[in-house]
């Protein structure tokens, strides 16, 4: 039997990869070879731009550090055996830590039975996860659509709002400046960063943006849309803007948005892809002011850092537009048994260990420390802000933020900038971070700022002379 063209090359690649997957440790020579190999394959087959983006995690100036395995709940180990304290959290996916044993065990047990669903028989874990989210989420949220990512959950929310509001003659969506809701076409239409939007114009029609946190601007736009017949179908917001730079709205803003939506018959969509699952000190950030959305978007930490999963949770009134034709919006892998097992275990850990409360306590400790550093280094730091374990340090310019991330990396602490605000470095560790590790982060931040300050002073003296 003839093999397929190019099969020998592909087989060699898969055999090599499977051999690596089986290995627990690497020799020094194997590490060096793997680092070079991964660098080359990123450059030649993934995207060379990622190598530049990951400059802050570069060893020796010629290749990016290559991830190998989790260390403990809150650490990562690279191929050279160096252990890093994770304060980036995979952009917010590791709320219950790396390889949390409860989550891993649930996924392994389900894997031993059936990894994916048949699409014909009823899958029990999807039913149980939907019931769990109905019990856990605020207000009248009752039905869940499951997908694989935050962007997909936002896409589902937009389509759900469209299906509900189109018969009512409402087609306009309102999002906020600085917003990040994803990069697929619908989600990107709500996202507010020109660099992400411009190459794909025109996006979906009917999306408007108002300043985040400005209730008067929202009121004015809703009124204007009403007068011109462009009635608003939905307002979509992050309760705290993550990629925008960890921007908190003024107190009372979210309740006022809820009131305006009710007044104008608009749905309220909360994108809690990054703020949900205990990250801010409550299970969901909207609970800080007891605001209940019509649609809630979840993902990232929902899978416990083990499986990708997203969810779009809605009230029965809104979700009922899918009852007559449940195939109106579906996805092959959404709600698969492995992902649902991970999500159920993640929620169990969050509740059993009261991790949202821990996030509030340890977040307060870290934020107090960062604010003290901001006062000590005002020539470098503009502001430290956040809520719970979602924090940011905003520097005076992009270069200073980049150099801070590089210095933290040298001290084996992982941090990175936000997508919409390059001079803002996010601090988004697992909620399982210990008090001792919190102190380690603050010590590393102080040393990094001391290094930057000394370098700045040296440069200034050299310039004067």
From Swiss-Prot:
GO function terms (MF aspect): diamine transaminase activity; identical protein binding; putrescine--2-oxoglutarate transaminase activity; pyridoxal phosphate binding
Protein family according to the UniProt entry: Belongs to the class-III pyridoxal-phosphate-dependent aminotransferase family. Putrescine aminotransferase subfamily.
Domain of life: Bacteria
InterPro entries: Aminotrans_3 (IPR005814), Aminotrans_3_PPA_site (IPR049704), Class-III_PLP-dep_AT (IPR050103), Putrescine_aminotransferase (IPR017747), PyrdxlP-dep_Trfase (IPR015424), PyrdxlP-dep_Trfase_major (IPR015421), PyrdxlP-dep_Trfase_small (IPR015422)
Name of the top EC class for this enzyme: transferase
Binding site for pyridoxal 5'-phosphate: 150-151, 274, 332
Modified residues annotated as N6-(pyridoxal phosphate)lysine in this record: 300
Biological role: Catalyzes the aminotransferase reaction from putrescine to 2-oxoglutarate, leading to glutamate and 4-aminobutanal, which spontaneously cyclizes to form 1-pyrroline. This is the first step in one of two pathways for putrescine degradation, where putrescine is converted into 4-aminobutanoate (gamma-aminobutyrate or GABA) via 4-aminobutanal. Also functions as a cadaverine transaminase in a a L-lysine degradation pathway to succinate that proceeds via cadaverine, glutarate and L-2-hydroxyglutarate.
Reactions catalysed: an alkane-alpha,omega-diamine + 2-oxoglutarate = an omega-aminoaldehyde + L-glutamate; putrescine + 2-oxoglutarate = 1-pyrroline + L-glutamate + H2O; cadaverine + 2-oxoglutarate = 5-aminopentanal + L-glutamate
EC number(s) per entry: 2.6.1.82, 2.6.1.29
Stated name of the protein: Putrescine aminotransferase
Name of the encoding gene: patA
Keywords recorded for this protein, A-Z: Aminotransferase, Pyridoxal phosphate, Transferase
Species classification: Bacteria, Pseudomonadati, Pseudomonadota, Gammaproteobacteria, Enterobacterales
GO annotation (BP), single: L-lysine catabolic process
Pathway linked to the protein: Amine and polyamine degradation; putrescine degradation; 4-aminobutanal from putrescine (transaminase route): step 1/1
Co-factor(s): pyridoxal 5'-phosphate
């Amino acid at each position: 039997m003839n093999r397929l063209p190019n099969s020998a090359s592909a087989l060699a690649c898969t055999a090599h990869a499977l051999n690596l997957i089986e290995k627990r440790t690497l020799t020094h020579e194997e590490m060096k070879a793997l680092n070079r190999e991964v660098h080359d394959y990123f450059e030649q087959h993934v995207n060379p731009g990622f190598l530049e983006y990951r400059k802050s995690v570069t060893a020796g100036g010629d290749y990016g550090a290559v991830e190998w395995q989790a260390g403990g709940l809150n650490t990562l180990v690279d191929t050279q055996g160096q252990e890093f304290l994770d304060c980036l959290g995979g952009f917010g996916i590791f709320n219950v830590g790396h390889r949390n044993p409860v989550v891993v065990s649930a996924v392994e047990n389900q894997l031993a039975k059936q990894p994916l669903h048949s699409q014909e028989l009823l899958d029990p874990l999807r039913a149980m996860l939907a019931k769990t989210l109905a019990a856990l989420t605020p207000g009248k949220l009752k039905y869940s659509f499951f997908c694989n990512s935050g962007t997909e959950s936002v896409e589902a929310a937009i389509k759900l709002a469209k299906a509900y509001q189109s018969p009512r003659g409402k087609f306009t969506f309102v999002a906020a400046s600085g917003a990040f809701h994803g990069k697929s076409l619908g989600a990107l239409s709500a996202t507010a960063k020109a660099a992400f939007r411009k190459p794909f114009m025109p996006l979906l029609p009917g999306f408007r943006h108002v300043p985040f946190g400005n209730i008067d601007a929202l009121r004015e736009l809703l009124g204007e849309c009403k007068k011109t017949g462009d009635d608003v179908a939905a307002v979509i917001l992050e309760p705290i803007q993550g990629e925008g730079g960890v921007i908190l709205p003024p107190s009372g803003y979210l309740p006022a948005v809820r009131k305006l939506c009710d007044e104008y018959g608009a749905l309220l969509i909360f994108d809690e892809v990054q703020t949900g699952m205990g990250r801010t000190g409550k299970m969901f950030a909207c609970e800080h002011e007891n605001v209940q959305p019509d649609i809630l978007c979840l993902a990232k930490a929902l899978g416990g850092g083990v499986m990708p999963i997203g969810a779009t949770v809605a009230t029965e009134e809104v979700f009922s537009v899918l009852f007559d034709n449940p195939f109106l919006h579906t996805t092959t892998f959404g709600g698969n048994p492995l992902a649902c097992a991970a999500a159920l275990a993640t929620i169990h850990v969050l509740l059993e260990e009261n991790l949202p409360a821990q996030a509030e306590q340890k977040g307060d400790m870290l934020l107090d420390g960062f604010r003290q550093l901001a006062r000590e280094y005002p020539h470098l730091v503009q502001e430290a802000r956040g809520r719970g374990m979602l924090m940011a340090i905003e520097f005076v310019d992009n270069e200073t933020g980049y150099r801070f991330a590089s210095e933290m990396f040298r001290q084996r602490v992982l941090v990175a900038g936000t997508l919409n605000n390059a001079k803002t470095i996010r601090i988004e560790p697992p909620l399982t971070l210990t008090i001792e590790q919190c102190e380690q982060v603050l010590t590393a931040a102080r040393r990094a700022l001391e290094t930057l300050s000394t370098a700045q002073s040296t440069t200034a003296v050299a310039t004067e002379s």
